[in-house]
């Protein structure tokens, strides 16, 4: 084979060395070894780069190998004496020849220097190295040629075969270069065979070593577990790897003894520690081998015969002769499944972990070494975890790392090259895990977790891996069915959650169940808030977990509510203990809080009203008032006119008004679902209290009138007032008073007046207890409630228009509502100065209205009508609620003004309405009673004035014009003076006694009213005595003389001095009024005409 060559003599040495170094890469055991591999790859690239440069310097021409060359190689390779290559091998490894020979020797032989410098990073170099590595580490070579020496020898035969064919089939320079290259490579092959350390050792199954994975597994945990793992090695032995296990343990022992194991002496702190490691490694290997031989007796016999056969102790020969115990390439997937399953079981049994890192390491090794498709590996891994999920040994939320690691293997894998079997199996696995995820999600969400970590992990797996995978092939109908079932199961889970709360909190006793149901509501609200914070985003873009929880549990809670409260709803609240009412109130408040926070539908509020407001509130308010009405009359008849009058309006009034107090107390204990309901309850109480107060006060008013013998003139008393009993009480009082003096009777009736005043004060105090914060809680609702329905009366009165005097125009106004069909037109009015219509229209409104006014002018001569101007009228009934009416001038598009009158008749019912109406009624009643008393006192005083002769000073002339009046004699005046002084003393004594009782017993406000009105009446009486009224009568008054004037003013001074004693209780001066000053001024201007009367000398 001597041929001329132009390439450097060391070119083929470098090439052969690179190939041998590539074979050493097949032993990868740990991270330190991987670092060595990386360094070795760099060394190989450097050697090949040098060879390329040398080729460039020697001007080696390009080589273009014909296709027949590759066909010959493919035909000769299966005829190798040691080869048992499957037919698929020929097609699979054709790429090796294309890249390794054609690309390496030909494509870059004539590169430029710049191209040479870039060659180290060129992808072709990496392709070449990987192709060589593929061939030498393929299943076929690693299994069929089970030692490196056989690989080397087979490679030498292959190179010789290719060289001979190149010499025969090629011509010219191409034949010389190719033949020289292959021949040199074959000749130098044995030299490198001696330098390859792996040729002296067993190399099992192309870089797959059982003991390696044993160490990986045990390295995850700790050294003691390694011992336990080895002692149970029989659990790790699949059906076809027994001989491989023996060989690998022998290899492990051999390397440990020769300091060539995974861990070298420099990896330990001292030589003694390393020796212990070697001793332990040898012990475990021998122990493991013995256990294998126990399980496989025929294998033990075979090894024993081969080991001690005379002249044949070569273990490699024994392996070749026992090829039936080695693993076939087609069995790699079952072996992978078995090993992964054993690994997972071991990890789970030791620490309940799923061994993610270990399984990831083993899977990547199978993909890289055994060339198993990533999809197949992922199918195997997911299949292994299936039974663990089915048996509930694992939770779906624990598989996050598994999906992340293994889906990264197929992330860059083209799904188009997947096998049909893998696609179908992977799709089924994804469908299973999807169903499993939904089931676990139901369990997690149904338990109302405090943390969302588990649920979030499940959702991340679904979103990131399952939904996004193209092989997740589920029809829309199946998905709809699964998610319908998901929501149904979740609702059932929440129902179970609620039922468990009921079992925990409810005991079956009505009283304790009130508190128990409240606690259930508290827990539901807390769980809702927790779910709301943990699951703020919507799941599957359609489910808000907290809303779904509220929908499922609030419905059950509201259904349970009436069954718990029915024991008390139909009972009189007076018969319910206070602590029970407080519990009902607490339950109601919690119910409202739960409904408010969950945003539950208002359509379910009737369930709350059924348990509370609808029956409970209204019925108990009515019961309280009805019970109070039954006691009003008896209290009035029993407590009136008793010696201790002050106790009546303090104790008795409290007793009578206690039902109203109870009603407000009851409403204070009830919380409100909305402002509208609060108004509704207070309005109901307002109507009840109105009837109650009218009955009470009208009873006192009637008793007051009957006791003073003043006829009751068609007073609006309540229909059910017991008049007969009140008259009997008044008659009984008059018969037993012992003194027919009506002043004594009146002073006994002060307590009735005081009571009316006191009732007014109590109502003010009770009205202040209305929870206005509740009424204004929801502003819009409250405003809607407050907007009245009103009847508006619009009067179109007059207008100031800018027209010339005596213009021939008549004017009319069109009033219309643009939002409705309301439209009215006034009559035509012709006025030289100002048109006056004075027309009134009426309509119903419920909110702000804007009316449009159009003023028309019509020529009275021609009949032509045109628009004079426009104006806009805004009517807001809410702003009219105070004044109830006003007049407004509206501008007419800068051409004058029009006067519009507005009045509104409000139809409003509010809590304030009833309170103010009752206050007004009480004030009117009190004033009527005081007026009765004032009129009676005025009559009593006028009788005294009449008895004193003061009324005789009112004298009139006869009908003729003659002055025939006779002067009073001095004796008669002295007698009149004496009688007047006596009557003054008598009246003063009576007033002192009577007004003492007034001062002591009558409340300050009614006392002041009585004094001021009485004083005003007295002033009018004295004015009548002093000055005649202005009338058209022909009768003429005779003026008073000086003595008469003095007597009149002495009476006035007496009353002034007497009433001045009460000035300290008056809020302002009621004596020195304008009326008093005008009466005092009469004496200064007193005169009569001389022609009418004869002046009387003093």
Swiss-Prot record:
One GO cellular component, as annotated: cytoplasm
Residue ranges constituting the MHD2 domain according to the UniProt record: 981-1097
Keyword Calcium among record annotations: no
Location(s), subcellular: Cytoplasm; Nucleus; Cytoplasm, Cytoskeleton, Microtubule organizing center, Spindle pole body
GO biological process, one term: adenylate cyclase-activating glucose-activated G protein-coupled receptor signaling pathway
SUPFAM superfamilies the record matches: C2 domain (Calcium/lipid-binding domain, CaLB)
Broad class of where this protein is predominantly found: cytoplasm
Domain MHD1 residue range list: 567-700
Residue pairs linked by disulfide bridges in the UniProt entry: none
InterPro entries found in the cross-reference section: C2_domain_sf, Glucose_resp_signaling, Munc13_1, Munc13_dom-2
Assigned keywords, A-Z: Cytoplasm, Cytoskeleton, Nucleus, Transducer
PANTHER family, alphabetized: ADENYLATE CYCLASE ACTIVATION PROTEIN GIT1
Subunit and interaction comment: Interacts with cyr1.
Reported function: Involved in the glucose/cAMP-signaling pathway. Required for maintaining basal cAMP levels and for producing a glucose-triggered cAMP response.
Protein's name in the database: Adenylate cyclase activation protein git1
Organism: Schizosaccharomyces pombe (strain 972 / ATCC 24843) (Fission yeast)
């Amino acid at each position: 084979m001597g041929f001329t060559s132009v390439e450097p003599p060391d070119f083929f040495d470098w090439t052969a060395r690179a190939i041998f170094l590539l074979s050493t890469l097949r032993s990868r055991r740990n991270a330190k070894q991987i670092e060595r591999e990386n360094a070795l790859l760099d060394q190989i690239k450097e050697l090949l780069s040098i060879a390329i440069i040398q080729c460039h310097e020697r001007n080696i021409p390009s080589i273009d190998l014909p296709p027949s060359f590759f066909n010959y190689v493919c035909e000769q390779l299966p005829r190798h004496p040691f080869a048992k290559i499957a037919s698929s091998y020929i097609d699979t490894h054709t790429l090796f020849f294309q890249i390794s020979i054609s690309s390496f020797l030909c494509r870059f032989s004539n590169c430029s220097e710049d191209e040479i410098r870039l060659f180290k990073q060129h992808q072709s170099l990496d392709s070449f190295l990987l192709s060589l590595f593929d061939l030498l580490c393929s299943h076929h070579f690693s299994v069929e040629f089970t030692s490196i020496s056989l690989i080397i020898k087979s490679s030498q035969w292959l190179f010789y075969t290719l060289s001979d064919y190149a010499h025969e089939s090629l011509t010219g320079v191409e034949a010389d270069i190719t033949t020289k290259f292959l021949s040199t490579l074959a000749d130098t092959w044995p030299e490198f065979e001696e330098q390859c350390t792996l040729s002296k050792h067993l190399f099992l199954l192309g870089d797959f070593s059982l003991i390696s994975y044993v160490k990986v597994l045990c390295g995850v945990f700790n050294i003691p577990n390694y011992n336990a793992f080895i002692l149970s090695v029989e659990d790790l032995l699949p059906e076809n790897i027994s001989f491989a296990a023996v060989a690998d343990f022998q290899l492990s022992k051999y390397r440990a003894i020769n300091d060539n194991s995974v861990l070298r002496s420099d990896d330990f702190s001292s030589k003694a520690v390393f020796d212990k490691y070697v001793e332990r490694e040898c012990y475990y290997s021998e122990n493991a081998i013995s256990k294998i031989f126990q399980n496989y007796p025929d294998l033990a016999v075979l090894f024993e015969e081969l080991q001690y056969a005379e002249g044949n102790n070569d273990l490699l020969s024994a392996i070749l002769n026992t090829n039936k115990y080695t693993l076939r390439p087609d069995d790699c997937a079952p072996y992978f499944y078995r090993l992964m399953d054993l690994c997972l079981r071991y990890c789970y049994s030791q620490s309940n972990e799923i061994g993610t890192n270990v399984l990831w390491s083993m899977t990547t090794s199978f993909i890289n070494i055994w060339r198993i498709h990533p999809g197949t590996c992922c199918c195997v891994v997911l299949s292994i975890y299936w039974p663990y999920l089915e048996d509930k040994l694992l939770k779906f939320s624990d598989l996050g790392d598994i999906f992340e690691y293994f889906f990264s293997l197929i992330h860059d894998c083209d799904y188009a090259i997947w096998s049909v079997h893998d696609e179908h199996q992977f799709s089924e696995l994804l469908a299973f895990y999807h169903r499993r995820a939904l089931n676990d999600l139901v369990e997690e969400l149904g338990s109302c977790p405090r943390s969302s970590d588990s649920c979030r992990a499940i959702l991340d797996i679904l979103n990131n891996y399952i939904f996004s995978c193209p092989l997740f092939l589920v029809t829309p109908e199946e998905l709809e069915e699964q998610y319908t079932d998901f929501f149904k199961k979740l609702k059932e889970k929440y129902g179970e959650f609620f039922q468990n709360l009921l079992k925990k909190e409810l005991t079956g006793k009505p009283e304790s169940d009130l508190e128990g149901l409240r606690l259930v509501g508290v827990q539901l609200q807390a769980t809702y808030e927790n779910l709301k914070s943990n699951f703020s985003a919507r799941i599957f873009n359609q489910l808000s977990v907290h809303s779904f929880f509220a929908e499922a549990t609030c419905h059950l809670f509201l259904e349970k509510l009436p069954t718990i409260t029915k024991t008390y709803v139909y009972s009189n609240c007076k018969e319910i203990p206070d602590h029970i009412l407080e519990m009902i109130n607490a339950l109601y408040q919690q119910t409202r809080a739960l409904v408010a926070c969950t945003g539950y539908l208002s359509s379910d509020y009737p369930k709350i009203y059924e348990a509370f407001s609808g029956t409970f509130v209204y019925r108990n308010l009515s019961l309280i008032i009805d019970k109070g009405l039954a006691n009003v009359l008896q209290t009035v008849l029993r407590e009136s006119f008793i010696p201790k009058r002050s106790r009546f309006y303090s104790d008795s009034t409290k007793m009578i008004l206690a039902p109203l107090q109870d009603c407000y107390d009851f409403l204070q204990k009830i919380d409100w679902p909305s402002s509208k309901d609060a108004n509704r309850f207070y309005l109901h109480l307002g109507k009840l209290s109105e009837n109650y107060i009218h009955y009470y006060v009208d009873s006192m008013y009637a008793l007051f009138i009957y006791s003073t013998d003043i006829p009751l003139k068609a007073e609006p008393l309540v229909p059910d007032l017991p008049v007969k009993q009140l008259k009997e009480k008044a008659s009984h009082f008059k018969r037993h008073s012992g003194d027919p003096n009506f002043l004594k009777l009146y002073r006994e009736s002060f307590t009735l007046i005081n009571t009316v005043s006191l009732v007014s004060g109590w109502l003010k105090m009770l009205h202040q207890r209305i929870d206005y914060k509740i009424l204004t809680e929801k502003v819009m609702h409250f405003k809607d409630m407050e907007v009245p329905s009103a009847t508006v009366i619009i009067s179109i009165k007059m207008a100031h228009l800018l027209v010339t005097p005596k213009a021939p125009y008549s004017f009319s106004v069109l009033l219309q509502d643009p939002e409705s069909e309301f439209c009215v037109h006034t009559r035509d009015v012709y006025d030289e100065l100002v048109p006056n219509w004075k027309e009134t229209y009426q309509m119903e409104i419920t909110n702000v209205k804007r009316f449009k006014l159009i003023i028309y002018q019509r020529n009275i001569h021609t009949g032509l009508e045109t628009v004079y101007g426009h104006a806009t009228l805004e009517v807001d009934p809410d702003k009219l609620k105070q004044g109830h009416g006003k007049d407004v001038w509206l501008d007419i598009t800068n051409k004058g003004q029009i006067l519009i009158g507005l009045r509104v008749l409000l139809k409003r019912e509010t809590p304030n309405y009833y309170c103010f109406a009752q206050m007004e009624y009480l004030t009117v009643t009190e004033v009527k009673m005081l007026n009765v008393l004032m009129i009676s006192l005025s009559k009593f005083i006028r009788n005294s004035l009449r008895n004193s002769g003061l009324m005789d000073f009112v004298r009139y002339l006869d009908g003729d014009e003659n002055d025939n009046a006779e002067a009073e004699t001095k004796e008669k005046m002295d007698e009149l003076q004496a009688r007047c002084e006596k009557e003054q003393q008598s009246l003063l004594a009576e007033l002192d006694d009577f007004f003492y009782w007034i001062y002591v017993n009558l409340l300050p406000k009614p006392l002041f009213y009585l004094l001021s009105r009485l004083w005003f009446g007295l002033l009018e009486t004295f004015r009548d005595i002093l000055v005649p009224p202005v009338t058209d009568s022909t009768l003429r008054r005779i003026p008073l003389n000086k003595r008469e004037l003095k007597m009149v003013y002495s009476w006035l001074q007496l009353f002034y001095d007497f009433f001045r004693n009460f000035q300290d209780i008056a809020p302002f001066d009621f004596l020195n009024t304008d009326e008093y000053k005008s009466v005092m001024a009469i004496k200064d201007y007193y005169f009569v005409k001389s022609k009418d009367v004869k002046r009387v000398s003093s």
